């Protein structure tokens, strides 16, 4: 992937940044693509860095992701909740599956979506093979994970657990307005200058 470079003029001359480093200076983190261990480590490092710099200022996390590995996503969520800096989440494009959990776990009152963003919630996906005992262990683990995800969604949205169970039984797509009405985000971001 080609990463754009930004040139900044300073008193000491020009300085070139990759676009993500330049955004990080403004406390902006881009969570885009599949959620996996590598991405989670990068996002967590950025969260910790920004929190260490100034834990009184907001961090802005822009999310455009189809979701991914639950343990990786939960590591991001746990870090968001561990640091002192408020984390504002903004869905751009798609916040699906694990990415919808990260979106909903943003600071209350600071969870947003752009007007044409899509949010998708569903039950965890998984599979198992091997001996019957191993399959049973895997099935029990995915049921525990489903319960945890449903409880997080209920807490963040204000929906009762039965509604969450019903709505995550299959893929449940939402527009930005539907996600706001559901309680997963607080508002829809629009350009105030237009």
From Swiss-Prot:
Active site per the UniProt annotation: 97 (nucleophile), 122
EC number annotated for this UniProt entry: 3.4.21.92
Keyword terms of this UniProt record: Cytoplasm, Hydrolase, Protease, Serine protease
Keyword Lyase on entry: no
Principal cellular location given in the protein's record: cytoplasm
Any one biological process term the GO annotation gives: protein quality control for misfolded or incompletely synthesized proteins
PROSITE patterns to which the protein is assigned, alphabetical: CLP_PROTEASE_HIS
Location(s), subcellular: Cytoplasm
Entry superkingdom: Bacteria
Catalytic activity: Hydrolysis of proteins to small peptides in the presence of ATP and magnesium. alpha-casein is the usual test substrate. In the absence of ATP, only oligopeptides shorter than five residues are hydrolyzed (such as succinyl-Leu-Tyr-|-NHMec, and Leu-Tyr-Leu-|-Tyr-Trp, in which cleavage of the -Tyr-|-Leu- and -Tyr-|-Trp bonds also occurs)
GO-annotated molecular function: ATP-dependent peptidase activity; ATPase binding; serine-type endopeptidase activity
Keyword Translocase: no
Cited function: Cleaves peptides in various proteins in a process that requires ATP hydrolysis. Has a chymotrypsin-like activity. Plays a major role in the degradation of misfolded proteins.
Protein name: ATP-dependent Clp protease proteolytic subunit
Organism of provenance: Lactobacillus delbrueckii subsp. bulgaricus (strain ATCC BAA-365 / Lb-18)
Taxonomic classification: Bacteria, Bacillati, Bacillota, Bacilli, Lactobacillales
Originating gene: clpP
């Amino acid at each position: 992937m080609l990463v754009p470079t930004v040139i900044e003029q300073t008193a000491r001359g020009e300085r070139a940044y990759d676009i993500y480093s330049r955004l990080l200076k403004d406390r902006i983190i881009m969570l885009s693509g599949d959620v996996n261990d590598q991405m989670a480590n990068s996002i967590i490092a950025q969260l910790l860095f920004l929190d260490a710099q100034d834990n009184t200022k907001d961090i802005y996390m822009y999310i455009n992701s189809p979701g991914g590995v639950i343990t990786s996503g939960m590591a991001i969520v746990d870090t968001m909740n561990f640091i002192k800096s408020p984390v504002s989440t903004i869905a751009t494009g798609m916040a699906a599956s694990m990415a919808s959990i990260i979106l909903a776990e943003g600071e209350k009152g600071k969870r947003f979506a752009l007007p044409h963003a899509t949010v998708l919630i569903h039950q965890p996906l998984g599979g198992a093979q091997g001996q019957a005992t191993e399959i049973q262990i895997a099935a029990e683990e995915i049921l525990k994970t489903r319960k945890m995800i449903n409880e997080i969604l209920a807490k963040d949205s204000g929906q009762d657990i039965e509604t969450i169970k019903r709505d995550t039984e299959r893929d449940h797509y939402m527009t930005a307005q539907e996600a706001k009405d559901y309680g997963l985000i607080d508002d829809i971001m629009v350009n105030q200058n237009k």
